[in-house]
Amino acid sequence: MKYELDKTSGNARRGRLVFERPQGTFSVETPAFMPVGTYGTVKGMTPEEVRATGAEILLGNTFHLWLRPGQEIMRKHGDLHDFMQWHRPILTDSGGFQVFSLGKLRKITEEGVKFQNPINGERIFLSPEKSMEIQYDLGSDIVMIFDECTPYPATFDYAKKSMEMSLRWAKRSRDRFDELGNKNALFGIIQGGVFEELRKVSLEGLVNIGFDGYAVGGLAVGEPKEDMHRILEYICPQIPADKPRYLMGVGKPEDLVEGVRRGIDMFDCVMPTRNARNGHLFVTDGIVKIRNAKYRDDTSPLDPECDCYTCKNYTKAYLYHLDKCGEILGARLNTIHNLRYYQRLMAEIRQAIEDDRFDDFVVEFYARMGKPVPPLQLADKS
């Protein structure tokens, strides 16, 4: 993988990731949003439908795919691309976030994490080395290091110890990745909670090890938005400019805009797909809660400005009807729309950066939703 930076507008960056795969060369235009395919599928969607929304890269979940179907079945198919029939780039997380979400079911040691398999109850062990081996079998185009996702709230001392262990695990991840002869990309993950000085130490340690890209982890875990913005404003300018920057697990449309304002290139989140299944649909001027009875006889399209299959063919009343009846098609049509909304948003962001009018775009984006523009806490790097 290589990263090409074309243009900046303030801190916002326009570029692309370029991947050489057996099927040819694939580009992922950045800033990019990655739909989440936890179990090797974006819920309810075929790969062709996901691609039709504009998605160029997907996220797969190492932890869940390790438990089911497992490495052996994955190897029998070739890799995750062959298993799910998506032959474009795939990024896989390391499994760290899911393991640490298990709470009392897991025990962290220097070696790794022992935990109870949530499927069958057996005790299993995940380490940096094991995570690299699983992701190698998945054929991930972008592999994430195994780290501890520092929870919120966390004291300075806890965040420091957690970050330092994540750095040691980063080196072990790098070493095992290289031993496997993996020719794909490996990203480091910056930790340190809401403490700027810890984030700086984490980044410096990762840069010394050397990675193909740098993710900001441990945000969107319950901290106030102001803290997330502050950490991004502080750390992004210090990340090597020739490497992509990935904000993990984020987020709402506003979060994507705010991330780009602060220099982020890549995002992933379950929000567009999960919200779609719950009847929360993103539109140009906010959110449509399709379960609201006022849409029962509404013959207008979901979003007149949207070019997705759902908006071109169906009314709000039909989507309301499908949801009310619990029809699977309702969830599918909602998902198509929400994923397309996110990809349209990213395309608009990329165009605004190209045209050097990203600041104007931000103002217009919030004006459409009737919201004020959140302030930047640090001065723009122009």
Swiss-Prot record:
Pfam family, one: TGT
EC category name: transferase
Keywords, comma-separated and alphabetical: Glycosyltransferase, Metal-binding, Queuosine biosynthesis, Transferase, tRNA processing, Zinc
Signal peptide bounds: none
Gene3D superfamilies (alphabetical): Queuine tRNA-ribosyltransferase-like
Residues annotated as binding substrate: D93, S94, G95, G96, F97, D147, Q191, G218
InterPro entries: ArchSynthase1/Queuine_TRR (IPR050076), TGT (IPR004803), TGT-like_sf (IPR036511), tRNA_ribo_trans-like (IPR002616)
Active-site annotation: D93, D268
Residues annotated as binding Zn(2+): C306, C308, C311, H337
Protein family: Belongs to the queuine tRNA-ribosyltransferase family.
Protein name: Queuine tRNA-ribosyltransferase
Lineage: Bacteria, Pseudomonadati, Pseudomonadota, Gammaproteobacteria, Pasteurellales
Encoding gene, per UniProt annotation: tgt
